[in-house]
Amino acid sequence: AHRRWLCYSNPRLAALLDECIGTGYRKNPEELADFAKYADDSAVLERLRSIKHENKKDFSNFFSKRTGVSIDTHSVFDVQIKRLHEYKRQLLNVLNIIGIYLELCDDPNLDVRPRTYIFGAKAAPGYQMAKRIIQLICMLSREIEQTPGVRDKLKVVFLENYDVTTAEAL
């Protein structure tokens, strides 16, 4: 429910919402629509930006402790977490990343905003295609890390043993 994924997992944002619209949204999520009146409030928008960056730093620290891999907190996080199936677009996302990778290999000076693709998935034990897609994601991650001129602009990480604790960190 929204209380777990907003209030518990994102206490900074919950505190801002409490200040701006009160605590009623915690029981009645429809009240979150009241936050729209702050869409042009520069002070609130700056606090949102700061909250987002602090949360990215928290996740980066969590991920680094868990895997030893660091993530650029100034990069755009593109997150796709769900059970892996051929039809759930993970493969399409991987093919898009390969396209970006090839463009950056051709032109390392290409002006792109650094982006971190974060995958988390589980595959059913007998679902070989899903396991192969996970292998492809991991191979692409290693290839990007070994390519100078690309690794500073593009990163792919795979969250192994994805669970609720990891989801809450995200």
State where each predicted segment sits.
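Catalytic cores of carbohydrate-active enzymes across secretory and cytosolic contexts
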Residues: 1-170
